[in-house]
Amino acid sequence: MDLKFATFSSEIELPFYSALFSSKLDHDKLDSSARPVLGLYEPRSQANPEASTRMQILGSALTSDQDESGPLGMTRAEGYIKNVNTIEEFKNTDKNAMIKKAGEQIWDAIQDGTIYSCPSLLASFRILSYADLKKYRFTYWFAFPALHSEPQWKRTEPIGRLNSDESTALVERIGTWRYMVDRREHGFFLAKKVRGEASGPRSSLDDPGVDIGYRWDIGSLRDFETGFFNDAAEEDRYVAFVDPSNYPEYPSWPLRNLLILVRQRYRLNKVQILCYRDTQPRRHEARSIILPLAMDQVGDVELKSMPKVTGWERNGNGDLRPRVANLAEYMDPTRLADQAVDLNLKLMKWRLAPNLDLDTIKNTKCLLLGAGTLGSYVSRNLLGWGVRKITFIDYGSVSFSNPVRQPLFKFEDCHNGGKPKAIQAAEALREIYPGVDVEGYALSVPMLDHPIHNEAKTKAEFDKLKELIDSHDAIFLLMDTRESRWLPTLMGKAANKIVMNAALGFDTYVVMRHGAKPLDDSEDTLGCYFCNDVVVAADSMKDQTLDQQCTVTRPGVAAIASALLVELLTSILQHPLKQHAPAPISAGTGSAVSYERDPHDHPLGLVPHQVRGFLSNFQNMIIRGKSYPQCSACSKPVLDAYREGGWDFVKTALASRDYVAELSGLAEVQRLAEKAAAEMQWSEDEEGMGEEEGEGELI
């Protein structure tokens, strides 16, 4: 009777798709070369025949060690997956050449005997796949290469079976043997009945009164060539394999390759195949079958060339076509969003910026002081870079003029006096991306030249501001007034944080990073927002007309400045010195000015100190400014006084801006300037008198 085989069907765990997604995105990138993947199969005693013979691909299949064999009772299969870059490449891959190459690996291992070290190659497989990382659709096609026997093997006698006692003894003996051999040998082995001896030691679970009249002996495939069967009668010799098939008469696919080995290595044209279908928990069921096989006589048993190879899997409709898994149908939407947020960023590492450190950016905790126009755009750009922790501080409410310029707010947010900006901005970010860790605090920042009306409340606001600055990595100054930025500038410098600042004019903007505390004892560092001031910041809203009180700018200025500010932050984070990175120094002059990357392999380019933009002529200038020894916010005397006095210093400074001017040295600078101006005026007066006398003499 002709022999028929039950083909393998693929069965992929959902976590495997996620692992393949991550592997492609984070490691393989454009590399589409084949990589190992572990397959597993097992006898399923309770499964319908159609549900048996499954090649299982677990979630850990890509990372499993070569010595692993998966859960207890499962047999390993050696596989490779080729995950190509485009669907066109998938379609154009030569499928015949691919399966032929897989068959050659099996054939060569049989020919040179290396199959004995890795019998699991007889159950090998290949996967051709394409992962659409944007749509979470995986197109894949399994191949289970099988070498065809010619002439075919046929069953010569009825199928044999073991009784319950024989099966139990066999299962026990195989279990003992497996502890002594490599896991790759577990699926294929030799078995013989040794008669004339006691059945040998039994498990405590066996019935001690049962004697089957022989004992089982198990050997590896290689043992055939060293005389394993020499002392056994022909009817007591079995070549065995783990058979996941539940069909009463049809063995599973791996037997095809095993029969080639039997012919090519053992030179046999007649053999008893033990299809091992029993498991330890159900060893009394005796499900294994014995196939007496023979093939027609041939002149030479040894094959001279590799036989025909087949084995591409049919899809659910029975067609020779690939399968498609739409992972989006099974994934939690929040998890989908998580992976989608990182997708474009990780694609940067494929070609354009392979050294980009995305984790550093992602894990940077950002504090945004101001949730208005700048705060809205900055937060959206931070989300685009994958930042997961964002905190807003703002004391204002959403007004009807805000939604058209501030993209985090809607018309409904303006009703009933307006929702608190910081709270609503946080809620809006959460709606955009649920995975962001965002908070909002309706908090007033203490400001210079603004009197303290409630000291307890102002101190509580100061304490909360200090707590938030200390717990974040990057501080963004995005408020409307100059004086509101003074205290956060001072606190950020004292805490050695990354401080980012953006300010707008009608058609101009400045984007800058504040200088950090020097790494050495020098005082040479980059300046802050206040280092160009010759007076201490005061109440800028007092006695101002409406157009001076509102931020009147061209609508695109805020978006441009915000984008540059976030890009500057990411460049800082990619520099090995972070906030201590030096500013680039220009080479050349005029239109020929240029800058060099420092370091030269910085993935994003320059890390400037300031970028000043002019929308009237669409130009940017890169500026490098040193810290000012008499700066009202970052000079050493002011920093030392703040570190020593804390709230007491801040309370004094808020009560009298002259105190800050005297402490920093700005007051003395002004006195010297006034004195110099007076002396210059006196000198000009003297020069004028001399000229008049001369003119008189000429006349």
Swiss-Prot record:
It comes from Sordaria macrospora (strain ATCC MYA-333 / DSM 997 / K(L3346) / K-hell). One of its GO terms (molecular function) is Atg8 activating enzyme activity. Belongs to the ATG7 family. GO terms for biological process: autophagosome assembly; autophagy of mitochondrion; cellular response to nitrogen starvation; piecemeal microautophagy of the nucleus; protein modification by small protein conjugation; protein transport. It is found in: Cytoplasm; Preautophagosomal structure. Keywords: Autophagy, Cytoplasm, Protein transport, Transport. This is Ubiquitin-like modifier-activating enzyme ATG7. The active site is at C550. The keyword Hydrolase does not apply. Disruption phenotype: Leads to lethality. Heterokaryotic delta-ATG7/ATG7 strains and RNAi mutants produce aberrant fruiting-bodies. One of its GO terms (cellular component) is phagophore assembly site. The keyword Transport applies. Homodimer. Interacts with ATG8 through a thioester bond between Cys-550 and the C-terminal Gly of ATG8 and with ATG12 through a thioester bond between Cys-550 and the C-terminal Gly of ATG12. Also interacts with ATG3. The C-terminal residues 653 to 691 are required for homodimerization, as well as the interactions with ATG3, ATG8 and ATG12; and the C-terminal 17 residues are required for the ATG8 lipidation. It comes from the Eukaryota. Induction: Up-regulated under amino acid starvation conditions and at late stages during sexual development. It holds the Pfam family ATG7_N. E1-like activating enzyme involved in the 2 ubiquitin-like systems required for cytoplasm to vacuole transport (Cvt) and autophagy. Activates ATG12 for its conjugation with ATG5 and ATG8 for its conjugation with phosphatidylethanolamine. Both systems are needed for the ATG8 association to Cvt vesicles and autophagosomes membranes. Autophagy is essential for maintenance of amino acid levels and protein synthesis under nitrogen starvation.
